[in-house]
């Protein structure tokens, strides 16, 4: 089975996109018509991951995040200066004959979300989710016996982290926790303030659920300090039970690519070996 036939099978598994789709998904290196020798699922095609894929005898890297340091994730370097790191990385991929294929938009469009299904599975939180039948980027969990320090320890263990930046009183009990989207300036909203004078940015919606839906703690991806994180810091200093666990974008979604190595073999009929790195 060729690399292109493998990726076509994965696209058939995902919801169909309009033919005009011109997003970040697709090939970033390699020859799609080469025979596939094996697949490595990884969040990011780092130099270390590339070398591990080669050692495993795999020539297809199935990834979720950018290869070459830009948001559009072009397969070439588009700037007015030379990027020697890009050149060396590209040469390494060419040397090993590895194709990089990115699946970001399609897997997030999956229902349920292809990344966060894996995150929830490998955290062991399926039984705690309380809005499993609803769509949207916010997922709620209710725990019978959870504290800030227990959550911190659990996330470190399950995500294989040395430490987590968090806000909260370690002994506070957490009942309702929300896994939320990225907390960046004006993200998900092109016009954060409308005619009624209210702020409509996503961060304000996260504050609303903490105020009105009894959410005690959040686990976001990307963060900035001046919106929700500042709100939570002030809440804690006022003696309220609020917390945030800033695990980081890549750390949060890593388990989703571990999950991909579970479902890809079935989708491709076990045609080639599939590894998670």
Give the positions of each predicted feature:
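Hydrophobic structural segments
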Residues: 1-277
